[in-house]
Curated annotation (Swiss-Prot):
GO terms for biological process: translation. The keyword Coiled coil does not apply. The keyword Ribonucleoprotein applies. One of its GO terms (cellular component) is large ribosomal subunit. Forms part of the ribosomal stalk, playing a central role in the interaction of the ribosome with GTP-bound translation factors. GO terms for molecular function: large ribosomal subunit rRNA binding; structural constituent of ribosome. Keywords: Ribonucleoprotein, Ribosomal protein, RNA-binding, rRNA-binding. Belongs to the universal ribosomal protein uL10 family. This is Large ribosomal subunit protein uL10. Part of the ribosomal stalk of the 50S ribosomal subunit. The N-terminus interacts with L11 and the large rRNA to form the base of the stalk. The C-terminus forms an elongated spine to which L12 dimers bind in a sequential fashion forming a multimeric L10(L12)X complex.
Length: 162
């Protein structure tokens, strides 16, 4: 007996596959208990940071991940699941989740960041990393400090009258 494939599910599969194409950072959230307004606000904040949020069916998501040869994420696909992808700085998107966790019922399940599976604990630590701009700024201040000290020392020496 041949099992007919529901065209709606095929469409969902293709849509989700396209949603994940070219994305190195995928996060899984449990949105149970969030109001529509809270979920809309979360989606808006994620989009502001060049990310995207989509509520998914777990079985279809499992098939898409299998199709993309991504393993180790099945444990995050239980219960209501929202998938978030990050186009640029994934840790900025993760920070948004943890801001929402403080004030709502949102739960972070885990993720897939640059080819590695991250559990909730790892994602929490990842969310605390500085952004690319903050890292560059910190690096520049480290480089600038010795030069500033040298300039002040030379200035002090030139101010001393012999």
């Amino acid at each position: 007996m041949d099992k007919k494939i529901n065209p709606k599910k095929v469409e969902m599969f293709n849509s989700l596959k396209e949603f994940l194409d070219g994305k190195d950072n995928i996060f899984f959230l449990d949105y149970r208990g969030l109001t529509v307004a809270e979920l809309t606000k979360l989606r808006s904040r994620v989009e502001d940071e060049k990310g995207a949020l989509k509520v998914v069916k777990n079985n279809i998501m499992k098939r898409v991940l299998k199709d993309k040869d991504i393993e180790g994420l099945d444990s995050y696909l239980l219960g209501p699941t929202a998938v978030v992808t990050a186009f640029d700085e994934a840790n900025v998107i993760a920070k948004i989740f943890y801001e929402f966790v403080k004030t709502t019922t949102l739960k972070v399940k885990g993720g897939f960041v640059l080819g590695e599976v991250y559990d909730e604990l790892k994602l929490s630590a990842y969310s605390k990393l500085p952004t690319k701009i903050e890292s560059i700024s910190l690096f520049m201040s480290v480089l600038k400090a010795p030069m500033s000290k040298l300039v002040r020392t030379l200035k002090a020496l030139s101010d001393i009258k012999v």
